[in-house]
Amino acid sequence: MQLQYVLTLLWIIFAQNVFSRPTISKVAPENIEFFGRVTSYQKPVKVPDPISMYQQFAGLAQQSNCFKTKINATIGDAQLLFSWGDDDKNQRMQIFRSKSLGIVTSWSGMNVTSLTSLLSAADLFLVDVDRKYFPRVKKGSKLYDGFQNAFKRAAPVLVKKIQYFQELYDEDRVSLTGLSFGAALADIALPYVKENLKRGHIHRVVVFGHPRIGNQEWADSLDTYAEGKFFYVVNGNDIVPHLPPREFGYQQPSGQIWINPSNSSNWKLYPGQENVHGANSIFGFSIKDHTGVYFRTEIGSFWGHCPATIGQD
């Protein structure tokens, strides 16, 4: 198992350095030209929501990484209602009630001290989506095998608890967030949760350090389900949003917000999939930028603020 993990990392590094990207010529605002996949040339715009909203999401994304959190703990305008997972085989999943975001589910990032957690993320091959969980996504949709398996273990608990807390608090808004591995799980959860809500709607999905997790068809499906409410935030030169490489068939969905330079207050939305003006305009190589300051709020994984703070960094 350790050998599998090491070989996976070496293969990713090899691909990032050896596979050259084809020359891109601007011919349309959104041009299908990268191995038949979408590349956006749209100019960046201002982020569409108040900064306070992104800060609240960042705080909850950080909080799910904290080992010791008591039920009813308060993070910004949110109260912790439920926690599940051991952060080993199962990523920690926490559910909050937020005054501004509704019922929010947050997943922790990868536990780098756990071999089981590392190997869950190391299973990088694209496989067909499980139609039991995703019956209406686009034909041909594929997902990163390790992430899909991790989500399937959490799915029954997730929907049951969201439905319960919606009824308990008479709340129609449902939001999702997470860092890294947790960001991938929030992405995968969006279609599943939307299909299984008995009331209400997806309010927002805002994730941080989001890796590529599926192919073009999955990215298209996510865009359809999200209806413009999914955003993934890239901090500076963070390497993770560049992995796995597009050369392996992977594709990011729409909704990139790029903070550049890292940890700064300079952020913009880069519309469309794989926008050439956003994080793809540089060679992302930094591991340090993966955990950093997002919207003046630290997301430091297990080494960050616990309890999380909001807008204080």
Swiss-Prot record:
Q: Return the EC number.
A: 3.1.1.-
Q: Using the chain's own numbering, where are the disulfide bonds?
A: C66-C306
What CDD domains does UniProt report for this protein, alphabetically? Answer: Lipase
Q: Name one GO cellular component term.
A: extracellular region
Cellular localisation: Secreted; Secreted, Cell wall
Q: Which residues form the active site?
A: S180, D238, H290
Q: Which residues form a coiled coil?
A: none
- Keyword Secreted attached: yes
GO biological process entries: lipid catabolic process
Q: Which residues are glycosylated?
A: N72, N111, N263
State the source organism's domain of life.
Eukaryota
Which InterPro entries has this protein been placed in?
A: AB_hydrolase_fold (IPR029058), Fungal_lipase-type (IPR002921), Sec_MonoDiacylglyc_Lipase (IPR051218)
GO MF terms held by the record: hydrolase activity
Signal peptide range equals 1-20
Question: What reaction is this protein's catalytic activity?
Answer: a monoacylglycerol + H2O = glycerol + a fatty acid + H(+); a diacylglycerol + H2O = a monoacylglycerol + a fatty acid + H(+)
Arranged from A to Z, the UniProt key words for this protein are: Cell wall, Disulfide bond, Glycoprotein, Hydrolase, Lipid degradation, Lipid metabolism, Secreted, Signal, Virulence
- Give the family this protein belongs to, as stated in its UniProt record: Belongs to the AB hydrolase superfamily. Lipase family. Class 3 subfamily.
Its function? Secreted lipase involved in Dandruff and seborrheic dermatitis (D/SD) probably via lipase-mediated breakdown of sebaceous lipids and release of irritating free fatty acids. Shows activity against monoglyceride and diglyceride substrates, but not triglyceride substrates and does not exhibit regio-selective production of diacylglycerols. Cleaves oleic acid from 1,2 isomers of diolein on both the 1 and the 2 position of the glycerol backbone, resulting mainly in free fatty acids but no monoolein is detected.
Protein's UniProt name? Secreted mono- and diacylglycerol lipase MDL5
Q: What is the lineage of its organism?
A: Eukaryota, Fungi, Dikarya, Basidiomycota, Ustilaginomycotina
Gene giving rise to this polypeptide: MDL5
